[in-house]
Amino acid sequence: LNAIEDWGTYHFLDIGEAALGVGIAYDWLYDEWTKDEKKAIEESVLKKCFATSKKVFAGKDSWMKGDFNWNQVCHGGLSVAALAIYNTYPEEAKFIIERAAECVPYAAKVYEPDGAYPEGASYWEYGTTFQVLLIEAMRSAFGHCYGLNEYEGFMESADFRIQLNGNIGLEYGYSDYHRGYYNEPVMMWYAKELGRSDLQQNELEKIERLLDNPTKISRLSFFDLLWWSPIKTDGSNVKGNLRCWQANGKMPIAFMRTDRYHNHAYVGFKGGTPYHSHGHQDSGSFIYESQGVRWALDLGTESYDKMRKAQLDLWNYEQNSSRWTAFRTSAEAHNLARIDSDP
């Protein structure tokens, strides 16, 4: 990675990811690096991560203070790298860490008040995982995390995620949903933090499914091992079997089910607005499953590459944006009550 001159100036998400990997490798393998290797890694972080990040504008639509997953990923990755080289470059590292502590709350506020995440299941896992990595890195270094785990709805978000799972093994795939990995290590962290055996059991069941399809394993699966811990509970805080659950906020959502078994009924429906990162014209839509069949579904994301090839304005969420001419993002692709063809 050091040999690559540019880690992603024009797609800063790549720099956030690279910074995380380099920071972990530098810190965890510190005694294995030679003096020259350490210096090369430090210089790459300073030049290709920190210096580049200082050129990012902080205005509208920027990830710097954005309310979407890029904020968590970029600040999280950069801060892990900063903590790794803190002893050598304390001033440079301090700037990155304090900036993250100031900016990440803009993303953390989208969980208010009950934990629902506007960007959907896929980007919940992505953004939330990086915020948790930032929290854990800060705790390890400083003994605190600037209160980044205390924002309203952030810890409750574990229930939101578990309620997205239907009874037949499918998720409620609203917004730009990518059906991805079976396991989500961040749920093991929530289980540990909340003392929730139901969350832990849910993640363990997902890991067991990997025996049948190992290609669906999360690239961060080693955190399942690091965040697992024995949980003793009397069951009083177990919520995974709730038959009704709802969340207010930027994207209100609700779920009901007759039970959690395969043949039982499950319905999920959402409100909110398409005018948000990865949004679809799906406000008021629903999904429904019963007798082991999902009768009403959400198709999830359209291929970004196909949308770019069609020259659609992929990240424009205005009413008349060409983004909505793609079928999967449009009202036509969702289960909506409509009047005169308008949602």
Spans of features found by a protein language model:
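Aromatic-lined, polymer-binding surfaces characteristic
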Residues: 1-170, 177-178
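Sparse, context-dependent recognition of short Cys/His-centered cofactor- or disulfide-binding micro-motifs
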Residues: 14, 18, 63-66, 70, ...
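Replace the tail clause
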Residues: 32, 36, 245, 326
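Short, charged N-terminal helix-start/capping segments
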Residues: 37-70, 189, 196-219, 291, ...
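General N-terminal targeting signals
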Residues: 46, 50, 109-112, 134, ...
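Glycine-centered flexibility sites
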Residues: 76-77, 115, 252, 292, ...
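Carbohydrate-active enzyme catalytic cores, enriched for enzymes
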Residues: 85, 123-295
